[in-house]
């Protein structure tokens, strides 16, 4: 996950080109198709921007870009911080230039990459609640 996040965030650095975003392996799952219909129109007041892919499972907002991807494998239990936002469990990881938040207990998973400019990063997660809630639950929750 960290290597994938690093590749994604490198596409965010300092230019106005569309961010380079890799499409997750399960992006075409029916659950991600449903989740993509619930992506927010804006995040932190920032509108949707183009990315390097036209996959509906990938969306970005603003500059620097907040990036969301649906179609990752569900996370295994972890000692990383886990928060519940509007009934959705999220695992938080600190990155060199921001944070990632990945749904926990959803299959497939959504990952949201949030640049430091939007700190504190968890405050952006309510915008992704409807998309995350569209994913099937595995029954696992933050503890």
Annotate each PLM feature.
Residues 21, 38-39, 76, 88:
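Secreted/processed peptides and extracellular or luminal domains of membrane proteins
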Residues 45, 50, 55-102:
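Mature extracytoplasmic domains of secretory-pathway proteins
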Residues 79-143:
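Extracytosolic low-complexity repeat regions of secreted or lipid-anchored proteins
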Residues 15-19:
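Bacterial signal peptide processing site
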Residues 23-46:
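Post-signal peptide N-terminal segment of mature Sec-exported envelope proteins
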Residues 10-14:
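C-terminal motif of bacterial Sec signal peptides marking the signal peptidase cleavage site
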Residues 1-5:
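Bacterial N-terminal signal peptides that target proteins for export
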